[in-house]
């Protein structure tokens, strides 16, 4: 890779401004990245991080400001042009051709040739060479569809490296990874740093920022707040700069009071194993029940079985003393169940459709009038209720949901389900990919729903979240219930011990 003085900047974005009709998304924002460094880019959802990067890649045309890369003023017109110049991005949503091989994906559009034919031997050798440099152990000949999420991310990094990328931007790269996979990813990122790359690292996970980053740039409401070395900064200082105020507590004060049991789950077993096996628990009115467990504990399988997504082979689901079948999601919804799924982008939202559609899609039937026509008045009224009740920040109900921040998207999904009038609200990783300020708002919302006597089940991989918001925690281990603990009386060590019981 090209040698560059460590004191020089690889990338300088200076005074970048971007306006949309009625909104100034960026106001004179700066981002300067050095070689041999990992640079955190932080800010709440909606702070302008994505808009800034879209200006870099030419997806948006900036209104003012300068972009200098390797000492030259540039204005990329596309991601492809940026990649070929040496600026690459590893997205949250991985963009790969699943039915093609690993090496096909790396060299797509620039295959080495031998005469009129693709030189498969050279392509294999070049792929192995890149993998060896980055300590990646993947067979270049396997189809991408067979890879894990972490391997797909490593493939994206290898592709960037094969383009001799000087700047690699990583957007929430660990959101779907296990701890072991995260550690391996960090090793690869550090190798890129050693080779002279400048890495822009976007994450809401503070512990990762402190572990791996050298410098940090903080944005708030489209404005550049500060850029400084990470050394000497505290988590509270960063949060304060991100939210513009001191966040005195990470979780709202618990005000809900669990009452009588409304849901009893007895010996729940899913049809297709390995999955949930002989799981029993109760949920009380106004209670927030957490579900904890290590990766592979089958936490998600519980709520999917209750919601009719997974077929049940045995066991009972009893709501208010009545035995339910919940053979499919439609029946579960009619019985008062709602499920906010784990993968917001792939199974939660229709990103290219507006807020109205995304708010009402779970219960379209109730908006039908005579001749099967939809009531625009009621649809508009209910959409506005979702926006107001969930405190969604949006210019209009006609705004495409994909353009909103993750926190606002999640609020709309929760609002969508509240329109169905559920008694049991199940939330799978409800704050994944959401910034610290928006997390607090989601927690407040969950607490308000518990105070309105909803029974709430929360699955989370974040131990502080479970300990901060729940009343009791069901600990899963390898598809089985290892125990249920009172949140106020338990510890992280006890939960981890239970989570290992059936391994």
Curated annotation (Swiss-Prot):
Top-level EC class: translocase
Keywords: ATP-binding, Cell inner membrane, Cell membrane, Membrane, Nucleotide-binding, Repeat, Sugar transport, Translocase, Transport
GO MF annotations in UniProt: ATP binding; ATP hydrolysis activity
Residues holding ATP: 43-50
Major place of residence: membrane
Subcellular compartments: Cell inner membrane
InterPro entries per the UniProt record, alphabetical: AAA+_ATPase (IPR003593), ABC_carbohydrate_import_ATPase (IPR050107), ABC_transporter-like_ATP-bd (IPR003439), ABC_transporter-like_CS (IPR017871), P-loop_NTPase (IPR027417)
Disulfide bonds: none
Topological type in the membrane: Peripheral membrane protein
Domain ABC transporter: 11-246, 257-503
GO cellular component, as recorded: plasma membrane
Enzyme Commission code: 7.5.2.11
Chain's role: Part of the ABC transporter complex MglABC involved in galactose/methyl galactoside import. Responsible for energy coupling to the transport system.
Assembly description: The complex is composed of one ATP-binding protein (MglA), two transmembrane proteins (MglC) and a solute-binding protein (MglB).
NCBIfam families given in the database record: PRK10982.1 (NF008215)
Family: Belongs to the ABC transporter superfamily. Galactose/methyl galactoside importer (TC 3.A.1.2.3) family.
Record protein name field: Galactose/methyl galactoside import ATP-binding protein MglA 2
Organism, as annotated: Photobacterium profundum (strain SS9)
Lineage of the species this protein comes from: Bacteria, Pseudomonadati, Pseudomonadota, Gammaproteobacteria, Vibrionales
Gene transcribed to yield this protein: mglA2
């Amino acid at each position: 890779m090209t040698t560059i003085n460590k004191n020089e900047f690889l990338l300088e974005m200076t005074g970048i401004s971007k306006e949309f009709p009625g909104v100034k998304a960026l106001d004179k924002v700066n981002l300067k990245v050095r070689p041999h460094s990992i640079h955190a880019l932080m800010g709440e959802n909606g702070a302008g991080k994505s808009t800034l990067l879209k200006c870099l890649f030419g997806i948006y045309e900036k209104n003012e400001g300068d972009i200098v890369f390797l000492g030259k003023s540039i204005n990329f017109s596309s991601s492809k042009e940026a990649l070929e110049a040496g600026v690459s991005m590893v997205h949250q949503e991985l963009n790969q051709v699943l039915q093609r091989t690993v090496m096909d994906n790396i060299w797509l559009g620039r295959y080495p040739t031998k005469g009129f034919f693709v030189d498969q031997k050279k392509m294999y050798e070049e792929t192995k060479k890149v993998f060896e440099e980055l300590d990646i152990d993947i067979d270049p000949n396997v189809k991408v569809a067979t890879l894990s999420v972490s391997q797909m991310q490593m493939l994206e990094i290898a592709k960037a490296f094969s383009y001799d990328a000087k700047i690699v931007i990583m957007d929430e790269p660990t959101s779907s990874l296990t701890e072991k996979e995260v550690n391996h990813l960090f090793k690869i990122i550090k190798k890129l740093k050693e080779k002279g790359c400048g890495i822009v690292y976007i994450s809401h996970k503070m512990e990762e920022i402190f572990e791996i980053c050298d410098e940090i740039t903080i944005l708030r409401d489209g404005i550049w707040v500060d850029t400084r070395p990470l050394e000497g900064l505290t988590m509270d200082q960063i949060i304060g700069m991100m939210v513009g105020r001191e966040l005195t507590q990470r979780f709202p004060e618990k005000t809900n009071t669990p009452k009588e049991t409304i849901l009893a789950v007895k010996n729940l077993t899913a049809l297709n194993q390995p999955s949930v096996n002989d799981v029993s628990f109760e949920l009380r009115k106004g209670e927030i029940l957490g579900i904890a467990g290590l990766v592979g504990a089958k936490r998600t399988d519980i709520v999917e079985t209750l919601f009719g997504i997974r077929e049940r082979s045995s066991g009972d689901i009893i709501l208010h003393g009545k035995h339910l079948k919940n053979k499919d999601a439609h029946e579960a919804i009619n019985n008062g169940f709602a499920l906010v799924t784990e993968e917001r982008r792939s199974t939660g939202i229709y990103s290219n459709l507006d807020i109205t559609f995304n708010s009402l899609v779970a219960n379209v039937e109730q908006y039908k009038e005579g001749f099967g026509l939809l009531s625009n008045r009621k649809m508009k009224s209910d959409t506005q209720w979702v926006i107001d009740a969930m405190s969604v920040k949006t210019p209009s109900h006609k705004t495409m949901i994909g353009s909103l921040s993750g926190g606002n998207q999640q609020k709309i999904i929760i609002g969508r389900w509240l329109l169905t009038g559920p008694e049991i609200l199940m939330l799978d990783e409800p704050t994944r990919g959401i910034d610290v300020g928006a997390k607090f708002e989601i927690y407040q919302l969950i607490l308000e729903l518990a105070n309105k006597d909803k029974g709430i089940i929360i699955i989370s991989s974040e131990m502080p979240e479970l300990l901060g918001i729940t009343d009791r925690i069901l600990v899963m281990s390898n598809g089985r219930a290892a125990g249920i603990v009172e949140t106020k009386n338990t510890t992280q060590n006890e939960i981890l011990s239970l989570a290992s019981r059936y391994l």
